[in-house]
Amino acid sequence: MAARAPKTALAEAKPETIYQRLGVPQRINAAGTLTRLGGSLMAPEVLLAMAQAAEASVDISELQSAASRVIAACTGAQAGIVTSGAAAGLTLATAACLAGWDVLRMAALPDTRAMPHRVLMARTHRNSYDHAVRLAGAEIVDIGHNDRGTGAGVRGLEAWEIEAAIDARSAAFLFVATPDTLADLPMVMATAHQHGLPVIVDAAAQLPPRSN
């Protein structure tokens, strides 16, 4: 019977990780920001800030307001909000488009029978995160052809298809940002905004850098 190799001093000194205690194998994350892989690894400064935040209690609404200012300054956006992940961000963005500043509508969600509740979306953009949009009470309306998705052609979404789908029940347009779709974004925004329709851009993996 072979003798077990002696442990080195380094191996003995290295503490067991939380994942080892739970029996969860670690992965090599080559995707970066994907929530389902745990998101990005935290920088030491972030870990320190999280540890400091855990030592006190604050009013979360006040914290969100302060965080919004920091996010806006870092990204160039008008405002920002901290969420638990990409799906939560889509749900909150959809809820904002459904309710706006109407407190009664906010209280009614996800019951959207008395308000515009349809979210337009290119058929080629449909994906598993659609559930996050419907969670807020929205109904997704497919528009356009699925030529690219089926490999039957190269035709993409056109402005007239968006205009034909907009009616009094429309609340927003959802655009999924990928290297293959970004070229259509200016047209989508111009067409939707012309009809007073906000555009939700799912760009969960586009930041950083700030230029995006």
Where are these regions (language model features)?
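Conserved PLP-enzyme active-site core in the AAT-like
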Residues: 14-37, 41, 68-82, 87-212
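N-terminal export signals
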Residues: 1-11
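A glycine-/small-polar-enriched, mobile loop at the entrance of the PLP active site in fold-type I
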Residues: 28-66
